[in-house]
From Swiss-Prot:
HAMAP family: Ribosomal_uS3_B. This is Small ribosomal subunit protein uS3. It comes from the Bacteria. The lineage of its organism: Bacteria, Bacillati, Bacillota, Bacilli, Lactobacillales. Part of the 30S ribosomal subunit. Forms a tight complex with proteins S10 and S14. NCBIfam families: rpsC_bact. Residues 38-106 form the KH type-2 domain.
Length: 217
């Protein structure tokens, strides 16, 4: 059987940037565990705030966390109360000075994480899986995507045997490295168990910047 490579991991360093931007030698494992703890904490605290990507940069005793969210008002809170509380909790968690940048996602329907999350929440509310996928596809195509593919897998409609069912519209060129493909995987907790939701969104081509090579013209 043919298996699909992770569309984002395949494009990192070509048209995608890293979500963690730091370098370490002996402290590598400590930093990695700290990154995972930060991401887990933010995803738990801001579960309703439509947070998609969490980027982490490091300097000496300083951590810069950039949150890409469709609901910046919910993250910031009244007079900045929520973001101040989050910063204090992250300072305590890491023992370092944490700076938080909030970046608004202008088109949530073109973000695979948010589209997948929306489908998963609908499945938890007993919306038919076909309807949830087709509605998400229509919204994404209306938002200007070149193509989208979705897949829901598990005990669909409570069936005894798990299966996967997906829909697509437009083109999703998984082999084209310059194709800007956003991918996400989400889970829905239903009464019959967990359902997996996968979303691929093709947003157009990106021409990678030419890198200067030593001795190159």
């Amino acid at each position: 059987m043919g298996q699909k490579v992770h569309p984002i991991g395949m494009r990192v360093g070509i048209i995608r940037d890293w979500d963690a931007k730091w370098y370490a030698e002996k402290e590598y494992a400590d930093y990695l565990h700290e990154d995972l703890a930060i991401r887990k904490f933010i995803q738990k605290e801001l579960a309703e705030a439509s947070v998609s990507t969490i980027e982490i940069e490091r300097a000496i005793n300083k951590v810069i966390v950039s949150l890409h969210t469709a609901k910046p008002g919910m993250v910031i809170g009244k007079g900045g109360a929520n973001v101040d509380a989050l910063r204090a909790q992250l300072n305590k968690l890491t023992g370092k000075q944490v700076h938080i940048n909030i970046i608004e996602i202008k088109s949530p329907d073109l973000d695979a994480h948010l589209v997948g999350e929306n489908i998963a929440r609908q499945l938890e509310q007993r919306v038919a899986f076909r309807r949830a996928q087709k509605q998400a596809i229509q919204r994404t195509m209306r938002a200007g995507a070149k193509g989208i593919k979705t897949q829901v897998s598990g005990r669909l409609n409570g069936a005894d045997i798990a299966r996967a069912e997906g829909y697509s519209e437009g083109t999703v060129p998984l082999h084209t490295l310059r194709a800007d493909i956003d991918y996400a995987w989400e889970e829905a907790d239903t009464t019959y168990g967990k359902l997996g939701v996968k979303v691929w969104i093709y947003r157009g081509e990106v021409l990678p910047a030419r890198k200067n090579t030593k001795g190159g013209k």
